[in-house]
């Protein structure tokens, strides 16, 4: 890891029982929008994004699509104000998972460095 902070994870664990229970009322299009937004947020390290960004992420070209995106944002994401009163969306569970994994891998990395250092001293 060479001093680099771990913050990019290529896989997102999907808790299928929770996901299915929380999305059973959505249309297939809305489920796709939700998954697309979750995946985008995960690849960006769970960083917040604007409503306009969400429309672009979901490739909206109609008011109907924008309405579906906003429905998903409003139901599953949290709107927060940031610098200059810019409002952005976050997903609480994604942020928690990202923080958990970052801490977990940082701890493993530190333990590995200690183990490697101990082995190198024993070899000499």
Regions found by a protein language model. Name each.
Residues 1-18, 49-124:
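Winged-helix/helix-turn-helix nucleic-acid-interaction surface
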Residues 1-43:
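Short recognition helix of helix-turn-helix/winged-helix DNA-binding domains
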């Amino acid at each position: 890891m060479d001093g680099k902070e771990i913050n990019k994870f290529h896989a997102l664990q999907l808790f299928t029982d929770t996901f299915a229970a929380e999305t059973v009322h959505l249309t297939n299009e809305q489920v796709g929008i939700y998954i697309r937004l979750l995946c985008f947020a995960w690849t960006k390290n769970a960083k917040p994004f604007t409503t306009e960004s969400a429309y672009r992420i979901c490739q909206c070209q109609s008011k109907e699509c924008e309405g579906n995106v906003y429905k998903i944002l409003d139901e599953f994401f949290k709107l927060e104000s940031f610098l200059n009163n810019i409002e952005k969306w976050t997903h609480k569970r994604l942020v928690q998972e990202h923080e958990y994994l970052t801490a977990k891998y940082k701890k493993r990395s530190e333990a590995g460095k200690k183990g490697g250092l101990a082995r190198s001293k024993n070899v000499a």
